[in-house]
């Protein structure tokens, strides 16, 4: 199995687990950095920083430059904090493509 297959399978499984726990809001799942790190470090076929680079490049997460997080207005804390934002629309497209057989 190649790295792209591993990354995609891992991404799909992570989002499926997250959507059972977190609310999908505006095609986004907002999670804490520690939660994201725990999921990405579970399978050590690549380092955390290498995986976040790939996630950013493939638009799996919504981020600002030079980081894997985005400022997010936390309504409970009433302040802006940095969170990981999973791009749910990318997940839907990737999952559909990954599970569809090409009739070539």
Language model features with spans:
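Extended alpha-helical interface modules used as scaffolds for assembling large macromolecular complexes
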Residues: 1-104
């Amino acid at each position: 199995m190649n790295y792209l297959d591993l990354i995609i399978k891992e991404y799909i499984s992570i989002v499926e687990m997250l959507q059972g726990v977190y609310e999908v809001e505006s095609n986004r799942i907002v999670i804490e950095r520690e939660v994201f790190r725990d999921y990405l470090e579970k399978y050590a076929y690549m380092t955390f920083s290498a995986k976040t680079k790939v996630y950013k490049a493939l638009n799996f997460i919504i981020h600002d430059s030079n980081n894997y997080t985005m400022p997010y207005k936390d309504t409970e804390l009433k302040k802006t904090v940095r969170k990981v934002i999973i791009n749910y629309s990318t997940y839907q497209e990737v999952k559909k493509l990954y599970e569809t057989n090409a009739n070539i």
